[in-house]
A protein has these predicted regions:
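Long, contiguous interaction/recruitment modules in multidomain scaffold/adaptor proteins
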Residues: 1-15
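Structural signature of tandem alpha-helical TPR/SEL1-like repeats
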Residues: 2, 30-41, 64-76, 98-110
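Alpha-helical segment of the N-proximal tetratricopeptide repeat
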Residues: 13-46
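TPR/TPR-like (Sel1-like) alpha-helical repeat modules
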Residues: 93-120, 126
Length: 129
């Protein structure tokens, strides 16, 4: 599950949190979401207010099949940044995986409204659309 547009990390490249974040992203990109989640969780403990870490950790948790944890993380991003289209989309996917299609529907609609040009968001989600 990739965002349509990847935002740049919002913290200092020299920090320990950034190093952990980059390692987590590398593990995620290499198809190792559980290892990615370990690094990203450590980064989030160091920088608890960073939505870029929270969103990437949500992606890792989703890829690892930990949908409840992923939904919690994406819900936190949505609460902090209500116009984050990707967080709404990822929350919809997580809720769908948990069998909560009705709850997912609103977040999918919001993602589509916030970023109507994203082909990924326009693809139907079974049981949600």
């Amino acid at each position: 599950m990739e965002p349509c547009e990847r935002p740049a990390p919002d913290f200092c490249a020299e920090s320990e949190a950034y190093t952990l974040f980059r390692r987590g992203v590398d593990f995620l990109d290499e198809g190792h979401p559980a290892q990615a989640a370990m690094y990203l969780s450590r980064a989030l403990r160091l920088e608890p207010g960073r939505n870029s870490i929270r969103e990437t950790l949500g992606r890792a948790e989703f890829a690892a099949g930990r949908f409840e944890r992923a939904a919690d993380l994406f819900r936190e991003v949505v609460a902090d940044v209500p116009d984050c289209d990707y967080a709404h989309y990822a929350l919809a996917r997580s809720l769908k995986a948990l069998g909560r299609g009705e709850e997912a529907r609103g977040h999918l609609r919001l993602a589509r409204a916030l970023h109507p040009g994203c082909e990924t968001y326009r693809q139907p989600l079974d049981g949600v659309d």
